[in-house]
C-alpha cells in the first residue's frame, strides 16, 4: 500500500501548510455545457523515491498545464506523480477529481494511506486498485502517462485498448516508461494513431487536447461482447 512518504513534509495531511488559497469559484457556475470540458487523467507512479527531485516539478507542471489549458484533471487519488500533478493543478485554481480504491474517506486515508488534499471531488469506488484503475481510465477523455510501474502500464493498456487518446511524457534518462511503452506499441502489431509523445508538459497537453477534440467527432458505443464500435 502507498504511504505519505512521497509527500513534501509541508504537504502531509494535517499540515497547516497543506491548504491551498485558490477560490473554488470555478466550481460554481451555471454553464449547462460543463460536461464538454475535457477530462485529462494523469497516470504515474505512486512512489517517486526512485526518481530525481526534478520530477516533482515536472509533475506539478503537468497539472498546471491541464488547468491553464482549460481541462479538468483526473487521477487515482493517490500519492506520487499524480498527487504532485494535482498540486500543480490547484496552484492554477483548476479542478482536481480523484477515483479512490477505497469505499470511503476513512478507509482511503487510514487503510490505503492515501491523501485527501488537492482533491475537489473523490469518487470512492470500493473496488481496490484494479477496479479503481478501470473506472479512472474510462472516466477520462484522455490520459497523460508519466513515470510509472505496473499500475501505470495497466492503465495505459486499458486506454490503448479502448482507443482513449494518450499523451506519453518523454524523459531524458530520468525514467524509462516512455521507452517501454514505445516498445510495447511496436511489438503489439496494433497501430494506434491516438498516442502522442513529448518531453514538454505544455506541448503534450496541447497535443492531447487536439486528439480529444478529434476523438469527440466519433461516438463510442460499448456492446455486450465488449467490442468497441465507432459511429460517425
Regions found by a protein language model. Give the residues of each.
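Short gly/ser/thr-rich secondary-structure transition/capping motifs
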Residues: 19-26, 124-127
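C-terminal amphipathic helix plus adjacent low-complexity
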Residues: 210-232
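Nucleotide-sugar donor-binding patch of glycosyltransferase catalytic domains
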Residues: 165-195
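Positively charged, low-complexity intrinsically disordered leader regions
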Residues: 22-55
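Short acidic-hydrophobic, aromatic-tinged amphipathic segments that line or gate anion-handling sites
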Residues: 122-127, 192-204
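Structural loop-to-beta junction motif characteristic of Rossmann-like glycosyltransferase folds
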Residues: 144, 163-166
Amino acid at each position: 500500500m502507498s504511504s505519505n512518504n512521497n509527500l513534501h513534509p509541508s504537504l502531509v495531511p494535517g499540515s497547516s501548510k497543506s491548504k491551498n488559497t485558490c477560490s473554488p469559484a470555478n466550481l460554481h457556475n451555471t454553464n449547462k455545457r460543463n460536461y464538454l470540458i475535457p477530462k485529462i487523467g494523469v497516470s504515474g507512479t505512486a512512489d517517486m523515491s526512485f526518481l530525481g527531485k526534478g520530477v516533482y516539478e515536472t509533475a506539478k507542471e503537468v497539472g498546471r498545464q491541464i488547468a491553464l489549458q482549460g481541462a479538468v484533471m483526473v487521477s487515482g487519488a493517490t500519492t506520487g506523480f499524480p498527487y504532485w500533478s494535482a498540486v500543480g493543478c490547484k496552484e492554477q485554481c483548476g479542478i482536481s477529481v480523484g477515483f479512490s480504491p477505497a469505499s470511503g474517506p476513512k478507509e482511503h486515508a487510514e487503510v490505503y494511506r492515501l491523501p485527501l488534499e488537492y482533491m475537489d471531488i473523490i469518487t470512492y469506488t470500493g473496488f481496490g486498485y484494479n477496479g479503481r484503475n478501470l473506472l479512472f481510465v474510462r472516466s477520462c477523455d484522455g490520459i497523460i502517462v508519466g513515470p510509472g510501474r505496473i499500475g501505470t502500464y495497466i492503465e495505459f493498456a486499458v486506454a490503448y485498448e479502448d482507443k482513449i487518446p494518450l499523451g506519453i511524457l518523454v524523459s531524458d534518462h530520468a525514467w524509462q516508461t516512455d521507452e517501454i511503452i514505445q516498445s510495447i506499441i511496436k511489438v503489439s502489431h496494433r497501430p494506434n494513431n491516438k498516442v502522442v509523445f513529448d518531453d514538454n508538459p505544455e506541448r503534450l497537453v496541447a497535443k492531447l487536447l487536439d486528439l480529444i477534440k478529434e476523438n469527440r467527432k466519433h461516438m463510442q458505443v460499448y456492446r455486450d461482447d465488449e467490442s468497441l464500435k465507432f459511429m460517425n
